[in-house]
Curated annotation (Swiss-Prot):
Organism the protein comes from: Homo sapiens (Human)
Entry protein name: Zinc finger protein 414
Biased composition (Polar residues): 84-93
Regions of compositional bias (Low complexity) in chain numbering: 29-48, 227-243, 265-285
Lineage per the UniProt record: Eukaryota, Metazoa, Chordata, Craniata, Vertebrata
Zinc finger annotations (C2H2-type) as residue ranges: 109-133, 145-169, 176-201
Length: 312
């Protein structure tokens, strides 16, 4: 018996090879037209080539332009804007717009006046309603305006006439006048300061005028002059305080008071002078006499060389 080869049958191999070659041709066929544009791109285009319109192949459903790679229909943009871009632009434009102040349809706008519960569908109706709450300022029929000034009983039918009349009572003054003494001041503050002083003077009674003197007042008696030599106990009699009483006042003014009775400088000097030992009161005269004798060119009798001021 002949052994059958374990390998494949040659007829089956022959049939299998054409199928594989066909698939290779189908795969390589699209690459052939793709290589053509590369060769055409290497050549310099002439004027005739630039003028010729593009040639479309008839193969395929829609055809394909010669020298261009196939592209899906979804990737080719149309002449108008794409729907995705329009949605983005519309979204940004709506965000940039200011919010609408108009209320949505069907919403009622309530009245803001206290005690009013009415609401209106539009702003115009609300504005017309607000006029009933705030009427324009005008004089009411039959109402009279009275002047508020004291001792004035004038009445006027309108507010404008009352304001014009009030200028007569309260005219703008450039100064402030005191009613008591009729003094004028530039500021209101200075007038208030003056009113305190003016009120005190008005309350205090005026001093009576001094009586007229028919005769001349007597001359004040002078104290007897004391001889300074008759008071040996006082070394400085001029520093002794003045003990004579002052004359009685003859008018409304206070008399002049001697400052010596108040015990200023003379009482302070007295104990110091009394405690200090010193020469008697006649020592000053003796010293002047001896000084005058020493200055003379004559010498004392006896011819002694002792100084003239020495004690014998």
């Amino acid at each position: 018996m002949e052994e059958k080869p374990s390998g494949p049958i040659p007829d089956m191999l022959a049939t299998a090879e054409p199928s594989s070659s066909e698939t290779d041709k189908e795969v390589l066929s699209p690459a052939v037209p793709a290589a053509a544009p590369s060769s055409s791109m290497s050549e310099e285009p002439g004027p005739e080539q630039a003028a010729t319109p593009p040639v479309w192949e008839r193969g395929g459903a829609g055809g394909m332009q010669q020298g261009s790679s196939p592209a899906p229909d979804s990737c080719q943009p149309g002449p108008g804007p794409s729907p995705g871009l329009t949605s983005i632009v519309s979204g940004t434009s709506e965000d940039l717009r200011p919010p609408r102040r108009r209320p949505p349809p069907g919403k009622q706008i309530p009245c803001s006046s206290p005690g009013c519960c009415l609401s209106f569908p539009s702003v115009r109706d609300l504005a017309q309603h607000l006029r009933t709450h705030c009427p324009p300022t005008q004089s009411l029929e039959g109402k009279l305006f009275r002047c508020s000034a004291l001792s004035c009983t004038e009445t006027f039918p309108s507010m404008q006439e009352l304001v014009a009349h009030s200028k007569l009572h309260y005219k703008p003054n450039r100064y402030f006048k005191c009613e008591n003494c009729l003094l004028r001041f530039r500021t209101h503050r200075s007038l208030f300061k003056h009113l305190h002083v003016c009120a005190e003077h008005a309350q205090s009674p005026a001093p009576p005028p001094p009586p007229a003197l028919d005769r001349e007042p007597p001359a004040p008696e002078r104290p007897p002059e004391v001889d300074p030599a008759s008071a040996p106990g006082l070394p400085f009699p001029l520093l002794e305080p003045f003990t004579t009483p002052a004359p009685a006042p003859t008018g409304p003014f206070l008399p002049y008071l001697n400052p010596a009775p108040f015990g200023l400088s003379p009482p302070r000097l007295r104990p110091f002078l009394a405690a200090a030992p010193g020469p008697p009161a006649s020592s000053a005269a003796v010293w002047k006499k001896s000084q005058g004798a020493g200055s003379s060119p004559r010498r004392p009798q006896g011819g002694s060389d002792a100084p003239s001021g020495a004690c014998r």
